[in-house]
Amino acid sequence: GATVLIGLTGGYPSGARGIKALLDSGEITQKQARRMLCFTVGAGPAFVISVTGSGLLGSVQTGIILFISQLSAALVLGILVGLFARGEEAPAEARGGASSASMPVSSALVEAASDGASSMISMCSFVILFSALLVILDQSGISSFLKEVFSSFGLPDRMASSLVPVLLEVTTGSTAAAAAGAGAPFLSFALGWAGLCVDFQIFSMLRSVSFSKAVFLLFRLFHGLLSALFTVIGLHFFPITETVFFSTGQSLSGGLALRA
């Protein structure tokens, strides 16, 4: 319960860290870890409401709708996963409790600090890697080529121009989408999808978990699409004035890259 809550509200990739901790302590099985991973990836409320809603779109109300949409999509996925998993094994008995309880405080502090530092270095490394990749794609003209490809399939230019960064890195993608005027539903998709940068952080963190990367990415896609759908519904019942979605990029472009 707590791990699911942290995964949905603690920001990327806190859910994966919680799953790893439960698996390492023997409180869940590999199957349960795989199921939890399908719906416990989410951005934190500070990033969604403050940065994306208030900062990029100019509306706290829109940010709240985005956050509720993301939570709703995750809950739908969690319910579906639970329905398909009904009748499978009961939760595993905790096997790591005794060793955790007997660990000296000094050792626990050292382990916690080492784990935190390792996670932070990993996160920063992937952010730098994907930021560099985006620059290479942009400078080489590949991003422009892909934009034309996306447009040829009927995707509006304001979405096609920012789809590559959205697919790769959520902060850069969200900023680009807002600057292009792609609208709240598209940003909601970006937040639900989370970007390959976050996905690779999770893959690195959960090397001990045997799971299909393709299935995981498919659930990320479903999460993004459901988030966008719920945002459309939310904006229908709680409409926001059009002025909210005007060019945020003029004042914010490039200024939020380090604020995720």
Each PLM stretch: what is its role?
Residues S59-V60, G78, G82-A94, Q139, ...:
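Transmembrane helix-loop junctions in multipass membrane proteins, especially transporters and channels
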Residues R86-S114, V244-L258:
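Intrinsically disordered, low-complexity non-transmembrane regions of multi-pass membrane transporters
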Residues A113-L191:
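Transmembrane helical segments that form the transport core of multi-pass membrane transport proteins
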Residues A46, L75, A182-A260:
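C-terminal transmembrane helix pair
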Residues T62-I79, R259:
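Alpha-helical transmembrane segments
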Residues L22-Q30, L37, S54-L57, E148, ...:
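Inter-helical loop and helix-membrane interface segments of multi-pass membrane transporters/permeases
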Residues G1-L57, S162-A180, P185-V209, L218-L221:
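Alpha-helical membrane segments and immediately flanking helix-loop junctions
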